[in-house]
Design a protein with these regions (language model features):
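Catalytic core of non-heme Fe(II) oxygenases with the double-stranded beta-helix
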Residues: 1-110
């Protein structure tokens, strides 16, 4: 589980390659990265205390957001996105006991 957040200011791009262990996973439908946007396009991010939120703040924040995409957690799938002030994303809680979410993350930072 990774709560709703945007990435650090100096991160330019994130790339992820997923490696699900299909022998051990019953259902990986909710394992991919979820991406969110504001319901109101005029909403300002500076109204919120933190860009990395605990579960309580994240829950309140999500009242103003809507999920517009969740990447499929499929073998050898590459996804990527550019960091913006509004590039909110999270990983849902995995309810399967002893599950392992394997991926390679490649992040490019600027100074």
């Amino acid at each position: 589980y990774i709560p709703l957040h945007t990435d650090k200011k100096n991160k330019l791009i994130s790339l992820m390659v997923y490696f699900p262990d299909l022998k051990k996973i019953n259902n990986s439908d909710n394992w991919g990265t979820c991406f969110f946007k504001f319901k109101d396009k005029n909403q300002k991010i500076d109204l919120w205390d933190s860009k990395f939120m605990n579960e309580e703040v994240s829950s309140k924040f999500l009242e103003h957001m809507e999920k517009f995409y969740q990447s499929p957690f499929t073998a050898n799938k590459l996804i990527g996105f550019l960091k913006t002030n509004n590039s909110f994303h999270k990983i849902e809680k995995i309810l399967e006991k002893n599950a392992l979410r394997k991926s390679i993350n490649i992040n490019y930072y600027i100074q």
